[in-house]
Amino acid sequence: MTYKDPSLPTAARVDDLVARMTLQEKAGLLFHTISWFAPPPGAETAESMIDGRHMNHFNVLGGGSPREMAEWHNALQERAAATRLGIPVTLSTDPRHSFSGNPGASMMAGAFSQWPEPPGLAAIGSAELVRTFADMARQEYLAVGIRVALHPQIDLVTEPRWSRANGTFGQDAELTSRLVRAYILGFQGERLGPGSVACMTKHFPGGGPQKDGEDPHFAHGREQVYPGGRFEHHLKPFEAAFDAGTSQIMPYYGMPVGTEHEEVGFGFNKGVITGLLRERYAFDGIVCTDWGLITDAFIMGQEMPARAWGVEHLTPAERVLKAFEAGVDQFGGEACPDLLAEWVEAGRISTGRLDASVRRVLREKFTLGLFDAPFVDPDAAGEIVGRAAFARAGFEAQTASLTLLKNGPLPLAEGVRLYVEGVDAGLAAGYGKVVPAPEEADVAVLRLAAPYEPRPGAFEAFFHSGSLAFDAAEIDRITRLQRTVPTVVNVYLERPAVFPEIAEGAAAVVADYGASDRALLEVLFGRAEPKGRLPYELPRSMAAVEASPSDVPGGTRDPLYPFGHGLLS
C-alpha cells in the first residue's frame, strides 16, 4: 500500500490513505478526547474508542512510572495497528513539568523534570533557557510516546484576576513573543519531523481579556471584553508562533463582546477561525477546539454544560456543524464522530471540506513518523524521563526565577535561628536552627500563596478566581508576626497578588512561580542567585484592579510593584 511506504513523499501517502478511508474512519480521526492512564470507574477506555469509534487522538490524564507510561502507549499502538488501516495513535498532554495540578489545565511534574511555571520562565526572560527547557521536555515526552503538547499558552495577563495566569508568560506581548519562538523551536525543531513534539499553541486569538477575570470554562466567565480597544494587541504572540511554525492552534472558549466578530465562542466563530486564522495569517495547520464545546459532561462529579457560549440553543449536532463551518479541523474533548458523519451523509458538509481537515491531521501523523515508528522503548523511557541533567536544569531555573522585590536581611547567615511557616522544617534545619516560636527566632520565613475565592464544585475549585487580596484576619496575623520578628515573605504568584500591608511590614519579599522549599532556601542563604523580574505588575489594591481595562497590559493605577521589577545582585 502506498501510504505504508516511507520512501514516498508525505503528500502521496496522505492522498493514498484518504482514498482508502470510510466516512466513519475520517470522522473518527477528527475527534481528540481525554483518556486516563488509569481510567476511573465508568470511564470509556481509549481501546474501546479505537475499536468502536475509529478514534486515534488522545489527551492523556494521569500517569505512572516512565516505563508504565511507555508500555501503555505501546499497547495502544498495537491496538491501533490491528484496525483495518492501522492508523497510529497520537497522544497529547497538558503541561506536566511544574508545580500546579489542575485536571482542566496542567499536571504536577511527577516523574518528569520539575521547572517553574511559565511565568517563572518569563521572569528569567532568557529565550535560550526556554528553548533548553522545551528541548528537554520534548525528549521526556518522546520517551513515553507523547507527540503533541497542548501548549504553549500565550495569552496575555491583562486581567489580573484570571485563573489561567500561571500558564502564561505574563502580561507583555514582546516578551511573550520572544519566548514562544524559543518554546516552539525547542519542542518542534526548525522543521516538524520524527524527533518533534508538535505544539498546539493556545488560546487564539488571546484568552486574557476575561470579563471580571472569570474563566470561560464556566458560563459566568464566557465573555471576553475589550474596553481598551486592544483586540489586535493580543494577536501579537500568535504572530510569533506562526513565524516559528506552530503545528496546531487551539481557539479559546470565550466569546468576544463589543467587537466586529460574531458574539459566539471562538471555536464557533467563522470570522476568527476562517477570517483571521486561515485567511489573514494563512495558517494551514490543525485547528483543534478547546475541550468540551459540543456535549454536556460530568467532571469530577460536577455537572458541566458544553462550553457552547453564544450557541447554547443549538443541539450538539448543530454545534458540530457550526464549528466545522467556522473552519476547525478537530474537536477537543469530544467523542461523537457520528454527529459529524451525519452532516456529511446529509450533504451539509461536503466530502471536499471533510477531506481538507483529514489531510491536515494525517499530514502531521506522517511528518511525526508515527506510521513508520509508532513504538517507544520502555527501557529508554526510564533513563530519559527525569534524568539527572534535566532535574538539575529545572532546579537551577527554579532558583533563577525567584524574584527579589524588597530586601533588608538577605542573604541570611548560616546557623541563624529560624521560625518557618509553609516551609519544611526538617529541610530548613539544614540551613539554620529552627525554633518553635517567632519570639525565639532571629528571622521568620513565611511562604504564602496568592489569595483566591474558593468556588463550589470539585472541578471549579481548581480554578483560583476572584479577589487577589488577603483577608483582614490573615493580614492582621501576618503583620503581628512581622512586628515580633524580622520576616522574609515569599508569595507564590500564580496570579498577581495584592498585598501592600504585608509587603510594607516585611523585611524582605520574594516572589516565586513554582519553586521548591530547597530552591527558596538556597536563595535566601545566598547559595543561589535570584534573577527574576516580575512578568506582570502587582496591583496596589482591588479597587485598582476593578477599575483597570481588562484588555490593557499593566493597566492598574499606581501598582505596588511594576512589570519588570526585581532586585538583582
Question: Where in this protein do the model-derived segments appear?
Answer:
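N-terminal beta-rich core of secreted/periplasmic extracellular enzymes
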Residues: 1-205, 235-252, 265-336, 345-370, ...
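C-terminal non-catalytic regions of proteins with extracellular/luminal or membrane-system context
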Residues: 1-6, 12, 143, 263, ...
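A glycine-rich phosphate-binding loop feature that marks nucleotide/adenosyl-phosphate handling sites
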Residues: 33-34, 95-96, 155-156, 199-207, ...
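A general structural motif
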Residues: 38-39, 228-235, 312, 422, ...
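Distinct, well-ordered alpha-helical segments
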Residues: 102-104, 212, 495-500
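Short acidic-aromatic active-site loops that bind/stabilize oxyanions
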Residues: 123-131, 227, 231, 387-394, ...
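Short beta-alpha connecting loops at secondary-structure transitions
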Residues: 164, 220-226, 258-263, 297-328, ...
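Binuclear metal-dependent hydrolase catalytic cores centered on His/Asp/Glu-rich metal-binding motifs
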Residues: 211-231
